[in-house]
């Protein structure tokens, strides 16, 4: 007779106290009405942002800008966590206050970008793999000591039906890399945000995006399972299901809501606490409206919220212009945008926050950061 011993052909379980901490942190990150501020732009990417407002990309200016963001009073009402670039995790403002302390003052959980960028996958037509697994465990330990409680790793795929993209090889590579990263993070008490971004590049229809996104997410969750990742202590950061940027058919926001929700229901286990969408180059306003269209289709088995970078910061940067006298106005803009997205998580955003400038597209082809 077969006894009740545990099945041995399975990954080792996390210690109970670690699993509990991860699950609690993940739930806090997707608390009702809150989302995540993605402020993890690399030094090269923030240079592009600063070039647009004609300020120099110096350590001091980067610290001043992050101080503007994190020092916004009341931000914690709408923002649960902030993803930081490594430099920012250890940085101080002009007054000598660590920037992470500003987040703590608002009850915002610090997180950290841990991937090391993209490289081409051999034997593919420039499809990408993400670097950064080497030494990740040691880095996670240091990030945890510095106050980080979650991490983010971005993988990228492109849709090109004529070239068969994404190939099965690239989907497999992306899925396995995300799963290994997630497992390493959890072993070191960091909640992993799993980001398989399908870029908006291309002229494909929304139906094609739905098919590809479904295939990718199914592969990702299979890999997470195979690597013993605790779903209750992880979050997913996917693209919304939209048509390609160059598609001639204008996509309605209701269709984005329908196809996105259908795709998630077909692929994402309810054990996962939440999904934090990336904005993917949508305008600030579109990112809020489309998130609203997703949430009006609830109730859902997971929290569906936001993890926006450009869609929270574009108008803030344009208002700030690198000038101290504009900091208060820029912070007011950030609060307005954060509140709009908070309302969208309830399906109660009516549109109009930020005026006409919030409708400007933030799309960048082959976006890297």
UniProtKB/Swiss-Prot annotation:
One of its GO terms (molecular function) is fructose-bisphosphate aldolase activity. The keyword Cytoplasm applies. The gene is ALDO2. The active site is at 195 (proton acceptor), 237 (schiff-base intermediate with dihydroxyacetone phosphate). Beta-D-fructose 1,6-bisphosphate binds at residues 49, 279-281, 307, 310. NCBIfam families: FrucBisAld_I. InterPro entries: Aldolase_I_AS, Aldolase_TIM, FBA_I. Pathway: Carbohydrate degradation; glycolysis; D-glyceraldehyde 3-phosphate and glycerone phosphate from D-glucose: step 4/4. It comes from Plasmodium berghei (strain Anka). It catalyses: beta-D-fructose 1,6-bisphosphate = D-glyceraldehyde 3-phosphate + dihydroxyacetone phosphate. The keyword DNA-binding does not apply. Plays a key role in glycolysis by catalyzing the cleavage of fructose 1,6-bisphosphate into dihydroxyacetone phosphate and glyceraldehyde 3-phosphate. D-glyceraldehyde 3-phosphate binds at residues 42, 45, 113, 195. This is Fructose-bisphosphate aldolase 2. Its main location: cytoplasm. It is a peripheral membrane protein. Dihydroxyacetone phosphate binds at residues 40, 152, 237, 279-280, 309-310.
